[in-house]
From Swiss-Prot:
This is UPF0102 protein CLH_1204. Belongs to the UPF0102 family. GO terms for molecular function: nucleic acid binding. InterPro entries: Restrct_endonuc-II-like, tRNA_endonuc-like_dom_sf, UPF0102_YraN-like. Gene3D superfamilies: 3.40.1350.10. It comes from Clostridium botulinum (strain Alaska E43 / Type E3). It comes from the Bacteria. Pfam families: UPF0102.
Length: 122
């Protein structure tokens, strides 16, 4: 089950990247990892550094995807973001935290993307 969830997560992140590129976002990193944690997607658009958490679901059994980005998860993303900014020396950017929800259809290969801009703040 763990590998299945990881595969679904990777698939959803790829769909999210495609969506972002089609909407004129510049992708800087996918799956950035350091000792503090991971950020799914780091992008830039209109001089804003955008940190994106991707969540995918087949159904609402466990709630809508955004609900799984808990306060502790948000704090961890913020901590990793600060580390990334220092590492890459990206001090002159405003930062925004988004969530991209990917709703997958079990019957066919269709999907729906919901991009929640400014989903949480520092």
């Amino acid at each position: 089950m763990k590998k299945f969830n990881k595969d679904i997560g990777t698939y959803c992140e790829n769909l999210a990247c495609d969506y972002l590129i089609k909407n004129n976002f510049k992708i800087l990193e996918c799956n950035f990892k350091n000792r503090l944690g991971e950020i799914d997607i780091i992008s830039i658009r209109n001089s804003i550094l955008i940190i994106i958490e991707v969540k995918g679901r087949y159904n609402y059994e466990f709630g809508v995807p955004k609900e799984s980005v808990s306060v502790s998860k948000q704090k961890n993303i913020i901590k990793v973001t600060k580390s990334y900014i220092n590492y890459k020396k990206l001090y002159n950017f405003n930062v925004r935290f988004d969530v991209i929800e990917v709703y997958l259809n079990k019957i066919d290969s269709s999907y729906k993307i919901n991009h929640i801009k400014d989903a949480f703040r520092t």
